[in-house]
Amino acid sequence: MLNYLWFFLAALFEIAGCYAFWLWLRQGKSALWVIPALISLTLFALLLTRVEAAYAGRAYAAYGGIYIVASIAWLGLVERVRPLGTDWLGLAFCVIGATIILLGPRWSAP
């Protein structure tokens, strides 16, 4: 269960870092936004290595579902945009897929 904490923290820092670049490059904010962006993205990478997984690719694939949950939450909470029904439907499919990937090795064990 600690994996989910690492996934959610990693998602928070990844989205925050990417959003800082978005503010600079898409919304004309100060280039100083690069500093928190780089710090956030570094923390994202470090946190993702804390996940207990035998293979990086599987950890990243499972993380993708968590990232999408966090992105939709960011859309609503930070950007103040109400998610569409299709956002929720896509999110549900992604979470199911990420769960299958994350739990797959346990189901496949002899």
UniProtKB/Swiss-Prot annotation:
Membrane topology, from the record: Multi-pass membrane protein
One Pfam entry for this protein is UPF0060
**Coiled coil region boundaries:** none
Key words, A-Z: Cell inner membrane, Cell membrane, Membrane, Transmembrane, Transmembrane helix
Localization in the cell: Cell inner membrane
What broad class describes the main subcellular location of this protein? membrane
Gene Ontology cellular component terms for the protein in this record: plasma membrane
TM spans (from-to):
5-25, 28-48, 59-79, 84-104
Q: Which InterPro entries match?
A: UPF0060
Q: Tell me which domain of life the UniProt entry assigns to the organism this sequence originates from.
A: Bacteria
Q: PANTHER family this protein is in? A: UPF0060 MEMBRANE PROTEIN YNFA (PTHR36116:SF1)
User: What HAMAP family has UniProt attached to this entry?
Assistant: UPF0060
Cross-referenced NCBIfam families, in alphabetical order? PRK02237.1 (NF002586)
Q: Please report which protein family the annotation says this sequence is part of.
A: Belongs to the UPF0060 family.
What is this protein called in UniProt? UPF0060 membrane protein PSPTO_1628
Protein source organism:
Pseudomonas syringae pv. tomato (strain ATCC BAA-871 / DC3000)
